[in-house]
Amino acid sequence: MKKNQFLKESDITAESVFFMKRRQVLKALGISAAALSLPHAAHADLLSWFKGNDRPPAPAGKPLEFSKPAAWQNNLPLTPADKVSGYNNFYEFGLDKADPAANAGSLKTDTWTLKISGEVAKPLTLDHDDLTRRFPLEERIYRMRCVEAWSMVVPWIGFPLHKLLALAEPTSNAKYVAFETIYAPEQMPGLQDRFIGGGLKYPYVEGLRLDEAMHPLTLMTVGVYGKALPPQNGAPVRLIVPWKYGFKGIKSIVSIKLTREHPPTTWNLAAPDEYGFYANVNPHVDHPRWSQATERFIGSGGILDVQRQPTLLFNGYADQVASLYRGLDLRENF
């Protein structure tokens, strides 16, 4: 496995650009002007946080035992733990980047189970201990690219999804893998109020082709920065597909179902002209309302130090995954 390219940094990003995209998305989803005004104070709080004031705590989960295979270690500059845990999209807990860290503490994972079903010979139901006991954990330093044109580099901890799917023994009819997030309105304010939750249809669902799910880069993730995932990052287990935009990385997964048919996905249902099923990172295919040619890397500095850099095709993983899409029109199948 080739090591990843080093990311170069250039061109400072203005503060006004940093928060513009979210409001555009909400308007496209039909959220009212009154609702759009709700996160304004939170935006101000987040600006203060990026300047170094009142930062949320870094992940404080249980320490994990894991290896560090050389193939997944690299010289990429890491995004600090407090930013990984404090700057998130998890609309079930609110629309602003700071809302998940503020509100996700109510998420209870002690009775959590994950069901694997559908086109499999051996359906499974696993708890969190099963995941950490059955599969050796490893740290992988991955790029993470949001569709909103910002990026991080994160040391995730987990195991390849293909190892989990192999236990269930997919049948020859399995062509896709459908994922579903926990639906817990009593713990998730975004499920109680459509304005807090962005007007999306819940539970959040995502999907991959089976060959994408079986690729060795695709990671079932249970930790970050050496510890168990905090709730705002998708505890107890989330998906990481590093060559795709971040919204494909479904959080707090309770169901994995192998299917014959193309599964629905939340953002594609909400805005099919803007969010495709594949969602491969591609600097040559813009979002209808902003360019994807460059991205703002969130590193160790404050907001005035956030750097703009070129977006890499497949987020820098083209050597590993481009063959999955040979003959596929990436503009048509975005």
From Swiss-Prot:
Annotated localization: Periplasm
Co-factor requirement: Mo-molybdopterin
Enzyme class: oxidoreductase
Top-level division of the source organism's lineage: Bacteria
PTM comment, free text: Predicted to be exported by the Tat system. The position of the signal peptide cleavage has not been experimentally proven.
UniProt cross-references to Gene3D superfamilies, sorted A to Z: Oxidoreductase, molybdopterin-binding domain (3.90.420.10)
Range of residues in the leader sequence: 1-44
Reaction catalyzed: L-methionyl-[protein] + a quinone + H2O = L-methionyl-(S)-S-oxide-[protein] + a quinol; L-methionyl-[protein] + a quinone + H2O = L-methionyl-(R)-S-oxide-[protein] + a quinol
Annotated GO CC locations: periplasmic space
GO annotation (BP), single: protein repair
One term of GO molecular function: oxidoreductase activity, acting on a sulfur group of donors, quinone or similar compound as acceptor
Residues annotated to bind Mo-molybdopterin: 88, 91-92, 146, 181, 233, 238, 249-251
Xref: Pfam families: Oxidored_molyb (PF00174)
Keywords: Metal-binding, Molybdenum, Oxidoreductase, Periplasm, Signal
Entry EC no(s): 1.8.5.-
Cofactor remark from the record: Binds 1 Mo-molybdopterin (Mo-MPT) cofactor per subunit.
HAMAP family, per database record: MsrP
Assembly description: Heterodimer of a catalytic subunit (MsrP) and a heme-binding subunit (MsrQ).
Function description: Part of the MsrPQ system that repairs oxidized periplasmic proteins containing methionine sulfoxide residues (Met-O), using respiratory chain electrons. Thus protects these proteins from oxidative-stress damage caused by reactive species of oxygen and chlorine generated by the host defense mechanisms. MsrPQ is essential for the maintenance of envelope integrity under bleach stress, rescuing a wide series of structurally unrelated periplasmic proteins from methionine oxidation, including the primary periplasmic chaperone SurA and the lipoprotein Pal.
Protein family according to the UniProt entry: Belongs to the MsrP family.
Protein's recorded name: Protein-methionine-sulfoxide reductase catalytic subunit MsrP
